[in-house]
Regions:
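A short glycine-rich, Lys/Arg-flanked "PGG" loop and its adjoining helix->strand segment in the class I
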Residues: 125-141
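Conserved S-adenosyl-L-methionine
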Residues: 181-191
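Conserved small/polar residues in nucleotide/adenosyl-binding loops
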Residues: 193-195
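Short alpha-helix
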Residues: 165-180
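Class I SAM-dependent methyltransferase SAM/SAH-binding core
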Residues: 53-56, 60-107
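A short acidic, Gly/Pro-enriched loop at the edge of an enzyme's catalytic core
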Residues: 107-117
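Conserved alpha-helix/loop element of class I SAM-dependent methyltransferases that forms part
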Residues: 31-53, 63-64
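Short, glycine-/aromatic-enriched active-site segment of Class I SAM-dependent methyltransferases
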Residues: 145-163
């Protein structure tokens, strides 16, 4: 199969895939990712207490959040992508979870010192806004995709440009430390994806 034929096939696949939240079940069994050296869910569970008031930033459709089985009345989510926001309003709000829409470069729509724990898996964030909404002694747990991730995949798709080349662990650590955070754990992995 030529590169042009592959691109056409991938474009067709993209059009046929129905996305609801961050449910990627349509590619299950067709993509192999190297495991990460940490377990994000376990990291969250290590800090999540029954009385914790939590925020899940960029929750998608709440798939991960719901797997935590945390009391809904102590849970808030944000979502910026309109289809996912609408899904959250239909799926999460009726459960009693607070759902808020966010916009890039705007303050988080919550009062200062609102949360014991802020979660963020692959969503953008402003370190100072996270600090503002955390209660004193609160925790921010994040897992991000850095600017150097998937370079081979980008090249395969014909896009060799990195959108955010300076977004990496080293630079983000400086931002967190400058904002007054204490970093309890950090690691990075540049994993390979096989399609």
């Amino acid at each position: 199969m030529t590169q042009t034929e592959k691109h056409a096939l991938w474009a067709q696949e993209e059009q046929s895939a129905e996305m609801h939240g961050w449910d990627f079940s349509h590619i299950r069994g067709r993509v192999v990712e190297a495991p990460l050296p940490w377990d994000y869910k376990q990291k969250v569970l290590d800090f999540l207490k029954p009385q914790s008031v939590i925020l899940d930033m960029g929750t998608g459709g709440g798939e991960f959040l719901l797997s935590l089985r945390h009391p809904f009345s102590q849970t808030s989510v944000t979502e910026s992508w309109q289809p996912n926001f609408e899904l959250c309003e239909k799926k999460l709000a009726p459960l009693g979870i607070t759902v808020r829409k966010t916009e890039e470069d705007k303050p988080l729509p919550f009062a200062d010192n609102s949360f014991d724990l802020v979660l963020n898996r692959h969503d953008s964030y402003d370190v100072n806004e996270v600090r503002r909404v955390l209660k004193p002694g609160g925790y921010f747990i994040t897992q991000q995709v850095g600017g150097s991730n998937n370079l081979r995949l980008r090249a395969l798709l014909g896009n060799n440009k990195t959108a955010m080349p300076s977004f990496n662990l080293e630079n983000e650590l400086l931002h967190f430390k400058n904002a007054g955070f204490t970093v309890n754990f950090c690691d990075q992995a540049l994993s390979l994806i096989h399609i």
